[in-house]
UniProtKB/Swiss-Prot annotation:
Pfam families: Dehydrin. Keywords: Stress response. It comes from Arabidopsis thaliana (Mouse-ear cress). GO terms for biological process: cold acclimation; response to 1-aminocyclopropane-1-carboxylic acid; response to abscisic acid; response to water deprivation. The keyword Coiled coil does not apply. Residues 89-98, 133-144, 165-186 have a biased composition (Basic and acidic residues). It comes from the Eukaryota. Residues 1-186 are annotated as: Disordered. Residues 30-85, 152-164 have a biased composition (Gly residues). InterPro entries: Dehydrin (IPR000167), Dehydrin_CS (IPR030513). Residues 105-116 have a biased composition (Low complexity). Induction: By water stress and abscisic acid (ABA) during the cold acclimation process. One of its GO terms (cellular component) is cytosol. This is Dehydrin Rab18.
Length: 186
């Protein structure tokens, strides 16, 4: 009887003779023919990763992409090293590493924190946007919420001519950028 096992174009079978179908991940990418396995490190969606032998996850906050032999290190706020052939699916949400991966949890460096909500002026709270959080961390930021600033209000009458005691507003960063753009200084 002829063996059809390792012929090109033939159907791959598992150890029990059952046909193996091509498997795809949630993004439609083929998961490879290496089967399943932890590959020595923990995947980011659970206790085990899907071993592909040739693909792993790259670096970054979301961690999508491919690495050499499945080795990669997360460089976001919480990154995880993977073992050989481990594959990353989903966002990096684990806080512990299971197995013999390359690295553990990467700790945040730097100082300072920003609250995720602020007073809305009506006795309640509202969530801050990412741009507001970034602006708070920049040097020269002055919190203007809850403070009414009267700039350029009434003059003394003598300064109405324009010379002498003109009061200039401090320009914001966006105003400075707009001035440098062609046609933006109107």
């Amino acid at each position: 009887m002829a063996s059809y096992q390792n012929r090109p174009g033939g159907q791959a079978t598992d150890e029990y003779g059952n046909p193996i179908q091509q498997q795809y991940d949630e993004y439609g990418n083929p998961m490879g023919g290496g089967g399943y396995g932890t590959g020595g490190g923990g995947g980011a969606t659970g206790g085990q990763g899907y071993g592909t032998g040739g693909q792993g996850y790259g670096s970054g906050g979301q961690g999508y992409g491919t690495g050499g032999q499945g080795y990669g290190t997360g460089t976001g706020t919480e990154g995880f090293g993977t073992g050989g052939g481990a594959r990353h699916h989903g966002q990096e949400q684990l806080h512990k590493e299971s197995g013999g991966g390359l690295g553990g949890m990467l700790h945040r460096s730097g100082s300072g924190s920003s609250s995720s909500s602020e007073d809305d002026g009506q006795g309640g709270r509202r969530k801050k946007g990412i741009t507001q959080k970034i602006k708070e961390k920049l040097p020269g930021h002055h919190d203007q919420s809850g403070q009414a600033q009267a700039m350029g209000g009434m003059g003394s009458g003598y300064d109405a001519g324009g010379y002498g005691g003109e009061h200039h507003e401090k320009k914001g960063m966006m105003d400075k950028i707009k001035e440098k753009l062609p046609g933006g200084g109107r």
